[in-house]
Amino acid sequence: VGWKWPETSVGWYRKDFSLDATDNGKHFEIHFDGIFRHAQIWVNGFYLGLEQSGYISQNYDINDYVHFDKPNFVTVRVDASLEEGWFYEGAGIYRHVWLVKSEPVHITPYGICVNTELNETFSTAKIRLGAEVVNDGRDKTACSVAYTLYNNEGEKVCTVAETQQELLPRAKADFNQLCMTVEKPNLWSPKNPYLYTLRTEVLSGNKVVDTRDTKIGIRKIDFDKDKGLFVNGEHVKIYGVCMHQDHAGVGSAIPDGLQVYRLQKLKEIGVNGYRSSHNPMTPAMIDACDSLGILVVEENRLTGINEYQIGQLKSMIMRDRNHPSIIAWSIGNEEWGIEWKNRGKEIAHTMSDCVNLFDPTRPSTVATSSGPAIVMDVDIAGYNYIMQNPVEEHRRNYPNRIAYGSEETTGCGTRGVYFDDIPNGRMASLNRVPELERDSAINRIERGWKFYAERDWLLGCFYWTGFDYRGEANPLVFPATNSEFGILDYCGFPKDEAYYLKSWWTDEPVLHIFPHWNLKGHEGEEVNIWAYSNCDEVELFVNGKSLGKKQMPKNGHLSWKAVYKPGKVKAIGYKNGKKLLTETIETTGNAAKLKTVETVNGDISVVDIYALDKKGNFVADACDEVKIKVSGKAEILGVGNGDPAWQAKERPLAGEDKQMFTVALFNGCAQVIVKNNSNIVEVSL
């Protein structure tokens, strides 16, 4: 699909549903979380509307169009012949669709508004409450609103209620005069993502006619121009990643449980920040960020000030404003044509004003690749790459500016590849090339983190990217079809540099050495052996011979040179002079068996598959084919292996067996995503 293939880029959906006659008199709406793109919607032949963007939610009142005595039909036309980004975006209905039934008097789709405030000692919270209620009935109605807060054990914390208002037919009313007080609140933070449930009830004639539950977090976010970011008074450095929204095997149609899995893999290496590059997020992903304690910069798709563009910005903010994970709204990314001009400054100023109007509790930001003008009039400046932005010069010239790294370079390379294989679309990580010149756009992951770690006034940074993603395969070309910028590959298997970040972003002891020792064809060649670790010192042994003990520099790495010969490499990490960790890699035999690790979130199981030799060692260069079989109600949704040039089919097609499939290992790893798994997933070589 896409602009090169217009004949295959238009798709139609048709779905029937039935309504019970007893529901006649209720109110019905249909909500689409996201359709890529240019989606036109009909119900029973009546046109509802058009949304051009593939990232904006659509909500339609269908009450006057539905039948109770015969089937109803929803028809959707999707046209993906034009892109919105320069990366893989998928096509079609890829997010949830909701049929919403309510009473005629009900809360509007984005009608709940919650803001939390804390006193100086963080011992008392005030929760400012708001609800927009609409009367979609035929008669004038009096109604009131009650709010009840529950803790995460389901216990009632407090209740408040607003006085009654009268609503004419089609009229709306705001119930926003109330405030709750919570003593000794359990605060939301990255380390303690505690969520309360706010229940909002609409009452008419002493009867509850609508109920909405909203997950909320009580927290206070502060930004300081000199000291950085504070959450509930505690200094927090952003350990962030930028992310697109696709995954091996399923593309952009990521199930909710897989969204959680992706965040879990990032948290394992210490990630606490997520930038939704470059579009509003799937609601399920923001829910996952709330529950896992991830700080979010949510990004608008289009930078502009016409009615439609500001409407997109407003839609994102109104939909997502109650999420405690969101700390800032980004108005755009790398607008090369205007970011260095006064025109860009003026547009950013207007959009920033709109952000502050729609949500006075959070700052605006924008990501610039080189032009300083566009960041002048937003609340927080976002710099894409220290190699492209004179960050320190801007600091000297504008000392009151709050700033962070909205994008920073990773090593860029293929998992498990240590010698370039360009014809086959795979490359060794750029992270390991000699130190580059200051004006080079290529930056080592290590140099980037040192820069941000050493400057308290910078909030932190978001690396490009957390996961590999489809498209934008540069600097490679076909057969490479995936980017290789990820810290984790397309499945979430860690590349070596993931352990660099884990060393400095977590308190967990880390010792990781590479490359693997299955370097067939490179016998007799000198090899650089690296260690990522947060130990004080590391000693390296190659085939039993010590190459010396070295002191680990802060936020750095260690390296030794050795001539490659099959055998064994061992590293010993020391803390306070005592042996703490030992890591061993050795030349292995062929893959003889498989190890599986299953992660279950809701109805989704992600099964990671690893190749082992007869001795139980991980075979880091295995590319064998694996047969997969599931049973019962389980279905295979997709498979992957992290190979950026893999051209095989990734999921069963319509009409094919969804319980048997094959996948090739890539450098020892593969993955299968299963729905409704209640049995063991069988895998075999």
Where are these regions (language model features)?
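Extended acidic/polar, glycine-enriched regions
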Residues: H67-D69, G130-D224, S559-G567, K575, ...
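Beta-strand-rich structural segments
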Residues: L129-V133, T148, E201, V527-S533, ...
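Extended substrate-binding grooves/exosites of carbohydrate-active enzymes
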Residues: F46, E51, H96, S102-P104, ...
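Short S/T/G/P-enriched beta-strand
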Residues: F223, T506-N528, N534, I585-V606, ...
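Short, hydrophobic beta-strand segments
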Residues: I62-D64, Q177-W188, S559-Y564, G655-S678
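Solvent-exposed serine/threonine-rich low-complexity stretches and specific carbohydrate-binding patches
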Residues: L48-G49, V157-R170, K545-P553, L637-F661
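Accessory beta-strand-rich segments of carbohydrate-active enzymes
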Residues: W3-N115, D136-G137, N152-E153, P280-P283, ...
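Short flexible loop/turn segments that cap and initiate beta-strands
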Residues: K140-A146, T159, P190-T197, N534-D536, ...
